[in-house]
Amino acid sequence: MPHLAELVAKARTAIEEAQDVAALENVRVEYLGKKGHLTLQMTSLRELPAEERPAAGAVINQAKQDVQDALNARKQTLESAELNARLAQETIDVSLPGRTIENGGLHPVTRTIDRIETFFGELGFSVVTGPEIEDDYHNFDALNIPGHHPARADHDTFWFDAKRLLRTQTSGVQIRTMEKQQPPIRIIAPGRVYRNDYDQTHTPMFHQMEGLIVDKDISFTNLKGTLHDFLRNFFEEDLQVRFRPSYFPFTEPSAEVDVMGKNGKWLEVLGCGMVHPNVLRNVGIDPEVYSGFAFGMGMERLTMLRYGVTDLRAFFENDLRFLKQFK
């Protein structure tokens, strides 16, 4: 079949001259498609004697296979060339720095809580937590707060019903701890508290941390020394600190603690006092044997003083321009 060899030669030439995969596909259809030149060669077999057809068919099939192999090889070459060209256009300089992702930062109130927990942790205090939905006994009664106290009024407290409320202080955590644990006790209780108030210096929800020590021979001197050290550590200054006599139902004697501000004025930072004997009795601790001190402070208040923030509400408005200053 001299004509067959000529067809294969032409097919090879067309394959080599194809400059892209699309042109190569046209060559395949021309020679190997249903009406391709080599495919039609099979129709000539009917003109041959029966005994010659198998050999002739084998020759045609081999020719078709040779052309298919040439097509496959050329296709691989063209695809590699196209890939290399595309990669050359999309060259990446691997020495360039990657895209940086802006790191987040801790909220300033969280920073304050962490800082205080670290300080008192080094003094042996444990961090304890409690429920934010509290009962009136742990929030008021056990803390020696009488039924007529204004803190119980609806305009100050969020009540669910006559017995349940959103806690107004974390002092309930102290009561729950003393109910379960006998002295010595040394804890701090951070957490969210709720009061019905909203203005430049008050929000309905804020963060508070209270501390408690109960042991033998605990005195007001221990309280003063602890808080002196804490405030100087927290503000990183040798601050002037004063204790003013005050009143809290759950401590006796009680005091409010002030620090001298940069403007020469005293700034209130926390309240404290010796645990009231009635509170100890309410949790089954003998006040003739044990004594203790407690203190409480607002985290937002301390954060405002530390960072010079003038509006408490800024902590809850999620303004990134404000929050990024503390990263």
UniProtKB/Swiss-Prot annotation:
Q: What is the lineage of its organism?
A: Bacteria, Pseudomonadati, Pseudomonadota, Gammaproteobacteria, Enterobacterales
Quaternary structure annotation from Swiss-Prot or TrEMBL: Tetramer of two alpha and two beta subunits.
What EC number is given for this enzyme?
A: 6.1.1.20
Q: Which domain of life is it from?
A: Bacteria
Q: Which family does it belong to?
A: Belongs to the class-II aminoacyl-tRNA synthetase family. Phe-tRNA synthetase alpha subunit type 1 subfamily.
Instruction: Write down any Gene Ontology CC term.
Output: cytoplasm
Q: Where in the cell is it found?
A: Cytoplasm
Q: Which gene encodes it?
A: pheS
SUPFAM superfamilies the record matches: Class II aaRS and biotin synthetases, tRNA-binding arm
Q: Does the keyword Lyase apply?
A: no
Q: Which organism is it from?
A: Pectobacterium atrosepticum (strain SCRI 1043 / ATCC BAA-672)
Cofactor note as given:
Binds 2 magnesium ions per tetramer.
Any one Gene Ontology MF annotation carried by this entry is: tRNA binding
Q: What CDD domains does the entry give?
A: PheRS_alpha_core
Question: Which keywords describe this protein according to UniProt?
Answer: Aminoacyl-tRNA synthetase, ATP-binding, Cytoplasm, Ligase, Magnesium, Metal-binding, Nucleotide-binding, Protein biosynthesis
Catalytic activity annotated for this protein? tRNA(Phe) + L-phenylalanine + ATP = L-phenylalanyl-tRNA(Phe) + AMP + diphosphate + H(+)
Q: Which HAMAP family match?
A: Phe_tRNA_synth_alpha1 (MF_00281)
A Pfam family the protein falls into = Phe_tRNA-synt_N
Judged by the first EC level, this protein's enzyme class is ligase
> What's this protein's name?
Phenylalanine--tRNA ligase alpha subunit
